[in-house]
Amino acid sequence: MVHFCGLLTLHREPVPLKSISVSVNIYEFVAGVSATLNYENEEKVPLEAFFVFPMDEDSAVYSFEALVDGKKIVAELQDKMKARTNYEKAISQGHQAFLLEGDSSSRDVFSCNVGNLQPGSKAAVTLKYVQELPLEADGALRFVLPAVLNPRYQFSGSSKDSCLNVKTPIVPVEDLPYTLSMVATIDSQHGIEKVQSNCPLSPTEYLGEDKTSAQVSLAAGHKFDRDVELLIYYNEVHTPSVVLEMGMPNMKPGHLMGDPSAMVSFYPNIPEDQPSNTCGEFIFLMDRSGSMQSPMSSQDTSQLRIQAAKETLILLLKSLPIGCYFNIYGFGSSYEACFPESVKYTQQTMEEALGRVKLMQADLGGTEILAPLQNIYRGPSIPGHPLQLFVFTDGEVTDTFSVIKEVRINRQKHRCFSFGIGEGTSTSLIKGIARASGGTSEFITGKDRMQSKALRTLKRSLQPVVEDVSLSWHLPPGLSAKMLSPEQTVIFRGQRLISYAQLTGRMPAAETTGEVCLKYTLQGKTFEDKVTFPLQPKPDVNLTIHRLAAKSLLQTKDMGLRETPASDKKDALNLSLESGVISSFTAFIAINKELNKPVQGPLAHRDVPRPILLGASAPLKIKCQSGFRKALHSDRPPSASQPRGELMCYKAKTFQMDDYSLCGLISHKDQHSPGFGENHLVQLIYHQNANGSWDLNEDLAKILGMSLEEIMAAQPAELVDSSGWATILAVIWLHSNGKDLKCEWELLERKAVAWMRAHAGSTMPSVVKAAITFLKSSVDPAIFAF
């Protein structure tokens, strides 16, 4: 049984939410955010307004308050059940009440209730949170203000308590009745090089000649068609550091919020010249739900998500090392593997997989990721070939905690590398499954290329395993560090490591220093990174480091209302209440008891609409029959007894769901493959053999723009094998024509060069020179590393 979230309402009442204003303060790689929701009741009856909105799952929400007609009401964090009861009680007694809570099934969805808003009254509701900023491959710090909340596909057994079960109205982005404004202030002692965004911004205003402080604003008219993303480039981001923050003065020592907290960041300098692994089991789990048929970017419809996915799989298949094992799964409402079980990577198995990939379509309906994951984990392990799982999805799943729990249970068997595709992807799902298994996560939005991010991650997965990772503290006598972050077991080249600790004991006199040492072993060699820091905690009224430390600890214990073990549930509740950071078990409630106007009958309920992006609704192929402003309801949900794999389709008053083939990777509905156009780079890569070589044939000649006869005539006499000549020409063509996308073909080019060295031998320098001359290329022969 499936349910589809979302309702296009026919009601014409004024929407009480008028605007959202956001203030962002970024210091180094931490962001503090204050978001204000401005409400006004233009009706003649008291209202209750309900608003569902997205948040990044790493956000530590620690404050909630309301300003009603000039009066400030500060909320209290309470046990969620108690807060809900108190909210209903306050409303029934004629008081005004405000409730903020996270969704029961996902960390990245929140809801806000404004109860008993009087006619003509205005209310400004402000929530505050802090979060770490992830580091991109090019050195940029990435801040995202989520603005898109896609409908989430719900599978049988999903939590009925989810706020996504509520059919909040959805409207086209151009009809959204409220606005968004944002001002961001950025500070870094290392200097700010530039700030970029996927949305129109005001020109960057530097607040000093040293460029250590800057401010940008979101241009007016944001359409909620994408998340607001800032890419911040500092002059230096790879400096290890320790930030020490003073605890709350009125809190007893020994408590998290009473003791000083430390935030430690390292950038391990792992040597790049280490040989890559040639073993492993690589499973690629690709989303084939209906939403994968939408474009990668709302601003650029040149490539659909499914098309980018197919190109990505081709690149991944060509880049795998000889001797490994692999498989491909497509999933939606059903799933099927390319092979019954993982197979050895050979020319034959690669070609068979490529044939399936070429025919792949976004035709599998919804987004049920749990079933294929369970099937993968049930499979036998291959001795000497550790499992590396690559998950590609637009993340439109409701019960993310169940999926994360499944990954966590099997974390000893594998590493999971996750990719969130498109706007509104669930950060809770994508980050959660990577964190649970020691992998990494990537988000692909705007003009990002799925191909580049996937191949960079494959390169990471092939790195030699870093072992014996440890973090040690050297502190004065009487002072010790209690680690709050999970033990670090995996390190990747180019990755930033962040850990939190609570310093317990007696803080020494001024001008005393401490030291933290990160130690790890790589292929038998021991490496150490050290950072020395002053033992002088600094006060912060927002307790930023303490809140982030609490959030880090909560992420290890809080798995939602249904999935959290009883032992962790109590710890998570107590930690949430002590730190003031919201969790699955707590909610913020504010009550204005000065308002004492008993409600005559039920309050008029107003659900604040949220935007819908065409193509974002998980299993739907949307046909607009009577405009977007009619209600979307199912006349009747599919029967719970409906056989698995049978078409799960029903009529709606506005949208009609088309037939979908729920077969495996090959669609029986559409056997022809969409061509790869004139993209010669993809065509060239497609024709590479599993061992890294190319064959000399008409396909290669067409890509090179020459006749086959010309190419054969130019082959040096000392090179007997025509494949060797073809391979050298292909590699030179890659460097000449695809250098901007080198990160996408770097691994497969390594295979080609290694194959050439083994086959050309001492003739390689002269053959390479002849090929460069023949192609009239300026490529440096050193790329072949004779």
UniProtKB/Swiss-Prot annotation:
Stored InterPro entries: VIT, VWF_A, vWFA_dom_sf
Domain VWFA: from-to ranges: 281-462
Domain VIT as annotated: residue spans: 1-131
Key words, A-Z: Tumor suppressor
A UniProt-annotated Pfam family: VIT
SMART domains: VIT (SM00609), VWA (SM00327)
A cellular-component GO term for this protein: nucleoplasm
Domain of life: Eukaryota
SUPFAM superfamilies: vWA-like (SSF53300)
Expression (tissue specificity): Expressed at low level in many tissues. Not expressed in 80% of tumor cell lines tested.
Function of the molecule: May play a role in tumorigenesis as a tumor suppressor. Altered expression of this protein and disruption of the molecular pathway it is involved in, may contribute directly to or modify tumorigenesis.
Listed name of the protein: von Willebrand factor A domain-containing protein 5A
Organism: Homo sapiens
Originating gene: VWA5A
